[in-house]
Amino acid sequence: MRHYEIILLIHPDCSEKLPIMIEKFKKLVIGYKGRIHRLEDWGRRQLAYSINKLHKAHYFLMNIEVPSNCIQDLSNTFRYDDLVIRNIIMHVKKSVTEISPMLKSKEDKLDKKDRVVVS
C-alpha cells in the first residue's frame, strides 16, 4: 500500500456538512482496507485568488495509506462532489503522523495570547 497526502478545499458555506463529508471519505478509505494516519481541520482560510467567485474556503488535510486503486475512487468522489472546490492528492514516501506546520502556527498564536508580560 502507498502513502498519500490529500488537501481538500471545501465550500465555506457548507462547513456544517464537513463532518458528514469526512465520514464518507473515511468509509471509502476503510472500505479498501486502508489506514488513516492523520486528519486535520485547518478551518476557514482566505484563498490566494478567487475560485468560483469565492474568496474563502474550509481547508482539510488527510494522510492515508491505501492501495492505488482507491485513489481513483477518491479522486472521482472529490471531482463529482459539488462542495469540494479544489483537491490535491500527493504520493508521499512514508506516513506522516506529526502535527502539520499549519496547525503548529495556530497553536503558537494561541500560546502567545496566553503569555503574560511581567515588567
From Swiss-Prot:
Write down the species: Buchnera aphidicola subsp. Baizongia pistaciae (strain Bp)
Q: Which family does it belong to?
A: Belongs to the bacterial ribosomal protein bS6 family.
This protein's GO CC annotations: cytosolic small ribosomal subunit
Q: Specify the protein name.
A: Small ribosomal subunit protein bS6
GO biological process terms, semicolon-separated: translation
CDD domains, per the entry:
bS6 (cd00473)
Its biological function?
Binds together with bS18 to 16S ribosomal RNA.
A Pfam family in this protein? Ribosomal_S6
